[in-house]
Amino acid sequence: FADSSGQLHAYNKSNGVFYRTKVENVCSKRDLYEVQYSDIEADSDDKYYARNLIETKLSESESQISVSYSRLLQCCKDAALEGDAFRRGRQAVCKLASNLIVRHPATMLADRNRAREGSSMLLEDVVLTEEEKALLDWSGWNGDHKALAELSAVATMFFSEDGSIPVNRIRETFLEKHFSILEAPIGSGFVTTSMSMFIIGSEDDSYDFDFAYMPLSSKYAALFTSDSSLEPFYRLDLPHIELMNCLHLLNCEHWDVALSRENGPLEHAIRDWAKTASN
């Protein structure tokens, strides 16, 4: 979404301010995936267990996704919607979508808290070998069962290959859906948000859904639907891209910042969203 200078236009929902910023400054929150020790001094420099471990592994995963993701965008540009590059790109988008869902703070908080609260019960019957104790001591756990349980929960949420883990079930659900590409018209572009998708038709006790929408770049967006009759590619006109941008803001429950490559589409989307939401 950024321009050639690495910047984009943004709108902060909480204060209603439009601004221009660099990509790395958008939606940045320090220590989002860090696990804090249970007993620490307020001014301690060593607050976190296995600091940067999760962030490093996430960066490695994102680097792998980005290669296929970039090739997918090139396939869209070339109208090459078949073949291995497009298939791998679609898989990368599904993996990214599932990761974004489970990594959102609103999703993580309950699981992390449950892990801490249940740490004593989970570990009371565990007998560690001397090698395991040595490994934990090397990791710097400091005998903190709550921190260990929370780190384990976060690592499982993000990186486990178990098919029953939510991130993998969500990815499989996306992969099963019919996939369509939307192209923005010249002179306009897609708007995205800090939670860069919306989903319709999902139930609390099910991983299935009817419809999901995810902007991929300022030029392209993806649809995931249960309707296999839809075409694989749609070139939108101006009214329809303005509609999709507004629908994104209206239907995405957890967004704090809206973003676009150019200022015009963003301002128009915010204006439409504010007007519709107030009715």
Residue ranges and their predicted role:
Residues 2-279:
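Alpha-helical structural context detector biased toward long hydrophobic helices
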